[in-house]
């Protein structure tokens, strides 16, 4: 199982760091990525539609301010978000 931890910007990592620490503690492989629903929508679409093909089983998504990122990702993949 491989998890994608995605956030809207680098500054959101301060929010996601506890998630990453927990995944490390349980030795669950994951990748961290910045995928912005507002600044890089094409990247968001490509990431979401290809996440399963790229080996992800689950996507953890968060962004500061607005919660558009998780909803946008969930609308384009059948993986749990």
Which functions belong to the PLM regions below?
Residues 1-37:
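Glycine-rich phosphate/diphosphate-binding loop of Rossmann-like nucleotide-binding domains
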Residues 12-17, 41-42, 63-72:
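Short glycine/serine/threonine-rich phosphate/pyrophosphate-binding segments
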Residues 30-52:
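N-terminal beta-loop-helix "entrance" segment that forms/cooperates
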């Amino acid at each position: 199982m491989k998890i994608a931890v995605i956030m809207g910007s680098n500054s959101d990592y301060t929010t996601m760091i506890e998630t990453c620490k927990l995944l490390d503690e349980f030795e669950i492989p994951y990748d961290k990525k910045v995928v912005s629903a507002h600044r890089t929508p094409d990247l968001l679409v490509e990431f979401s539609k290809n996440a399963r093909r790229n080996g992800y089983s689950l996507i953890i998504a968060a962004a500061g301010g607005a919660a558009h990122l998780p909803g946008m990702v969930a609308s384009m993949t059948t993986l749990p978000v």
